[in-house]
Amino acid sequence: MKIALPNLSFPYITGISSALKTLEDTCDIEVFVWKAEKPLMDILDEIKPDLIFLYQHQANITLDLAAESLNFYYIAFSSSPLQLNKKPIAYITDREYVTNFINYQQNTLMVKPSANVAQIHNGQNSNTLQSDISVFNNDIQLGPEHLKILRWLTTQYNTKLFGPQKIAMPEYLGNTDIFERADAIKSSLISIDLGNFSCLDIAYLKVAPVVLNGVHELYKNFKSIKELEVILNNLIKDKERKEYCNSVYQDVIDSRTFYHRIAEIFQVIGDSERSQGSLNKLEELVSC
């Protein structure tokens, strides 16, 4: 099976793409990541994918024209059903739009925050990156509240800051690639999630996640620096860190990885064998 995905820099499509790449042998698939600027007809004609992932703005009459001579299925990331003759085999939508798909419930999935296991699995402890606390500003826009928290953290704890947004603090060490990010998380005792769902990657690496304005009861959540201080002092002193890390790690490997999302996708399009293959790959990684 040939599967094509656009190279859009959205965390969800990046996570799906990364995990699918690791499933090429397990699930007998070929994965192609195409430049989103390239005309859709060219992609369909050159690659001839069996399955293609498209965002709503990419799904247009080209699909109807291509379907006259090419045999393919597509999955649409969309906020509403598409008005095309060539219908998607499945939809993926955000929770806020799910009521728009009331007539498509059987083939509609919701976007769910997930750990990008394929990118972070090999994270290693690094002497250079060791810290009590790590913070990453990927996939969020830093505001006054975030900066206030970061300034407080850097005066109270051995903190290292990373990410594409430059921060005028000596503790800011710059942006990281996917491997450096995994190592930096693994080399800290605690990592702060400022609202970008990094808590799931953190939990998978068995590091303690602490989440700004989090709502999941299993995770350590805070809304103020005072609440954060109490949480950090307990975790740094190891009063509950090991038990906490084990519980959130189990939560992630039970249902919160992109391998689970891919299993759901294959299941909804009627491919139970590849669905199970995705879960088997996760089990293989976890057992290493």
Segments from the language model and where they lie:
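Catalytic core of nucleotide-activated saccharide and alditol-phosphate transferases
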Residues: 58-156, 256-257
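Short, polar loop motifs at secondary-structure junctions
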Residues: 36-37, 56-60, 78-82, 93-100, ...
